[in-house]
Design a protein with these regions (language model features):
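Membrane-water interface regions at transmembrane-helix termini and the short interhelical loops
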Residues: 60-64, 68, 126-149, 214-217, ...
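Hydrophobic, membrane-embedded alpha-helices of multi-pass small-molecule transporters
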Residues: 9-17, 163-169, 179-245, 284-293, ...
């Protein structure tokens, strides 16, 4: 049980931990100043807690989120919601972004300006070709990512953090930003929430279930116990690297001009690497960032292809994997900025819906809930999420004004109280539904 859980946990941590997870903690460390400890506590509590809880809820029943959403809300909604989620977080956003991030941070600085355009094409051809070859055999990713690549990038990050702590430890942190001075834990909590990692948890729960089935279990008790081991491994690995990277950012001296943009994480990683490793710094950074991004790319291709193959089996897994790899490659080279412009609002809409679904599933594990009440809850959260994005991102003023009067709107959580009210109503409305108890196949 412990071995199966540890292996699966390392695999999931490897595909979870991407470029954004490298950059956010050093930024928080620099911006939180003397309030680092409560800030990183809030960040870990939400960023790790929400993601791991969403992952566990999605794997407790081997039928996954598609079954939970279909039975509690509606089959058509489950297919629509998950299709949009997988496409948004996969080939149309995160997959190409991981490739371009690996190139821009790790490879581009090694090239002359004249060769950077050609360099991107060559790099992404090799990058996506390697990811595609691994993704063609999903049953092998436990060995190739969980046993090999995850330890590689984790060790590289640990080396950077340890050497950074030795070199910069004891340095007085810079003054905290106004937000962290006002509420360090609260600001850290919101930064963790805004990583959107719960969306990846939904996507990667498919890989978790398939990997656990592949390992085999003698009983439902062993399966469930292993899932909790998986959650603990992922949580500990994330927390350790988040705290280490955050401490590096907190101790590293960042000039004022690098702080102005509000996200000094990339500057800290590149400059700290340069000062610690000297002439080999860029090679170290290239290896660390590329491997970190690559594992996420493989995970996204596999999970997206597996989902669509399960929902629409007329097309083979290989065709889906090929299509999503080619789409990611094309966008990485032709139009990433435009795609990100439209993908991020979609992800921001999906996020509160995802959290609301997880809340419903958790409560329904303990008490019966009304199906109309659950449907109403998700409908209200969806409307608020869409109105919030249209109001803030697309400047629809009357919608922005409507959303702003809701509780916690300033904290980017206008949907939270309506979701809680909807769940409470589900306790008293008719047509109550017990949580399904699964049996091992």
């Amino acid at each position: 049980m412990a071995k199966k859980g540890t292996l699966t946990g390392l695999l999931l941590f490897g595909i979870f931990f991407g470029a954004g997870n490298l950059i956010f903690p050093p930024s928080l460390g620099a911006l939180s100043g003397e309030h680092f400890l409560p800030a990183i506590a809030g960040f870990v509590f939400s960023g790790v807690g929400i993601a791991v809880l969403t992952l566990i809820i999605g794997t407790l029943n081997p039928k996954g989120y598609i079954y939970e959403i279909s039975t509690k809300i509606a089959p058509w909604f489950a297919t629509l919601y998950l299709s949009v989620l997988y496409l948004s977080i996969g080939p149309f956003f995160a997959t190409p972004r991981t490739a371009t991030t690996a190139y821009e941070v790790g490879i581009s600085p090694l090239l002359s300006d004249a060769n950077k355009g050609l360099g991107l094409i060559v790099f992404t051809v090799l990058y996506f070709a390697a990811a595609y070859l691994i993704s063609l055999n999903p049953s092998k990713i436990l060995d190739r990512i969980g046993r090999i690549l995850t330890p590689v990038f984790a060790i590289l990050i640990v080396i950077l953090v340890v050497l950074g702590a030795i070199k910069y430890g004891g340095t007085s942190p810079q003054a905290a930003s106004a937000a962290y001075q006002a509420s360090a834990f609260g600001t850290g909590f919101l930064e963790g929430y805004n990583t959107l990692d719960a969306l990846a948890s939904v996507a990667f729960s498919v890989i978790a279930v398939q990997t656990l089935k592949q390992l085999g279990f003698s009983s439902k008790k062993e399966y469930i116990s292993t899932i909790w081991v998986v959650g603990i491994v992922v949580a500990l690995a994330f927390s350790a690297l988040y705290i280490g990277l955050g401490f590096l950012g907190n101790q590293f001296p960042v000039p004022a001009e690098a702080m102005k943009g509000g996200t000094p994480g990339v500057y800290i990683l590149s400059q700290a690497t340069q000062e610690i490793f000297g002439s080999t710094a860029q090679l170290f950074l290239a290896a660390m960032v590329t491997v970190t991004c690559f594992t996420t790319t493989v995970g996204l291709i596999v999970s997206t292809a597996e989902f669509f193959n399960e929902r629409f089996p007329q097309i083979s897994y290989k065709v889906y994997a090929t299509a999503f790899t080619l789409i990611g490659f094309a966008i990485a080279n032709l139009g990433l900025d435009a795609i990100i412009k439209y993908s991020i609002p979609v992800l921001v809409i999906l996020y509160p819906i995802t959290i609301a679904i997880v809340m419903i599933v958790i409560v329904n594990k303990f008490v019966a809930l009304s199906k109309p009440g659950m449907q109403l809850t998700i409908a209200v959260v969806t409307v608020i999420a869409i109105a919030s994005v249209l109001g803030s991102s697309f400047k629809v003023e009357f919608l922005a004004n409507l959303v702003s009067v809701l509780p916690f709107a300033k904290a980017s959580l206008p949907w939270l109280v309506p979701a809680i009210v909807g769940i409470l109503l589900s306790l008293v409305l008719p047509n109550k539904q017990e949580s399904d108890v699964f049996e091992m196949e």
